[in-house]
Amino acid sequence: DELITSKDFRSVTFDSLMPKIFARYPIEFVSAKSVDRRFFQNLHSQFETLKRILSTDFSALGIDRRKAMVEPSFICEALGLQGRLDFLQVENGLCGIELKAGRPPYPENDLSKVSFPHRAQCALYQSMIQSVLGVKLENQHFYLLYSRNLNPEGCLRPVKTSTRELQKLLNLRNKIVSVERDISRYG
């Protein structure tokens, strides 16, 4: 969040950020079993990846972090969906980014590959934005950001959603809700 919201993200350092992260998530750090040197090396690597993306990839794609919201929440009663998107820029063309702390699907150098659950999540966000903000799918630019990708050019991957894909996802969601309702009713 601080890289996006600071006046100058270049001045934010990993060392200055760590005490703030510890203060915000003390229970998570104390209870985690795998917080060791390697954990912090991975965290530092992801931090540097995010800084690089902000300085190079964002400007190349016309994304302006200063015109963005961090973690806006959406509730869409019409679709029965809710969620919190990691990054949303509304001005100068709508752009949404969902951050994933893991690696993209194999092979990592195939920049068209995104995980199906991650793609579905972005598609549902796009559907909510269309419903809530009135921005048509074709006017939305969505990306998955895999911060542990080994290929620097492949961290930010576009996700385009079609109306047909959204219909399939919503139908699947409706079937799940129907089964859950039946289980709660009939056991």
Where on the chain are the PLM-derived regions?
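Helicase P-loop NTPase motor core of nucleic-acid translocases
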Residues: 184-187
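Mg2+/Mn2+-dependent nuclease catalytic core
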Residues: 63-178
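Metal-dependent nuclease catalytic cores that hydrolyze phosphodiester bonds in DNA/RNA
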Residues: 1-90
